[in-house]
Amino acid sequence: MLTNTAPAPDRDSASSALARERGGAQPLTVRDILGAPLAHKAGRPMARAVIRGLLLAFGRCIVQVRALERIAADRDPFILALNHSTKLEALFLPAFLLHARGGKPLHFIADWNFKLVPGIAAVYGAGDVIISDRKPARPRWLNVFRPLLTDRMPAFSRAAERLAAGASVGVFPEGTTNRDPRRLLRGFHGAARLSLQCGVPVVPAGIGFPRHGNTPRIRELAPMTIEFGEPLTPPSERNLSGSAVRAWHARVMCEIARLSGKVWSNENHRPV
């Protein structure tokens, strides 16, 4: 216990210690969720409530986490790149990472059109999400709201700005939900290009579904495991040629495939 004369613990050090302590984490308990101080969200009670609410509702879906220390707050800046298999994981997985990092944001790039769903704007605000306006809304008439719900700066330009400031960014390079339990999508090159442009490492991560059996599609809220890989450091020369970006993207996707137990190829196929 600290005495009155002891210096206050550094917030990054405290959240990093929490991540390391949970390096081989099992499911969060209610005590874990409600007891975490979330020091980086001090003064933001709504954000703390949203993070805890998401974890209370969905946190039990995460049954095992390996090498969580690789995304600790004192490892910033980096780009977290992981596969994307269900819609709801895009809400509760960032909440889990915020919790593990003491509330320090890991700025995920997310589609603007989900802000049309009641309550999602609050979730995006709690996670300090970077908004992408790439996808249109359905039905089309909802696109009239796009200027009100998006940033004038392109998402990856905003992400580069955050990285330059020492923050970390999260990307689902597949670009959409892919319920195929065996194959990754070819994916988009944005995360690879951002890594090469900014000279920051990519931390690959694989989400696995150990209980999906032989079903052809991964269902919502299926129990999942998460494994974080070793950081991939980009070449020192900032080569943004098409071939260099494609090669770096392939390396990242192959690591995600290995960690998630899926396969990846450069051939395009439709998401399941």
Feature map (PLM): residue ranges:
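Short, structurally constrained coil/turn elements
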Residues: 57-59, 74, 102, 165, ...
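Helix-to-loop junction immediately C-terminal to a conserved catalytic motif
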Residues: 52-84
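Short amphipathic alpha-helical segments and helix-helix/interface helices
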Residues: 51-55, 94, 98, 120-121, ...
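Catalytic core of membrane glycerolipid acyltransferases/transacylases, capturing the structured
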Residues: 33-34, 74-148
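Acidic/glycine-enriched edge-of-secondary-structure segments
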Residues: 47-56, 138-151
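Short hydrophobic helices that act as membrane-entry/anchoring signals
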Residues: 36, 40, 44-60, 121, ...
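Non-catalytic C-terminal accessory region of glycerolipid acyltransferases
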Residues: 2-34, 141-272
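Structural motif corresponding to alpha-helix initiation and N-cap regions
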Residues: 65, 117, 153-156
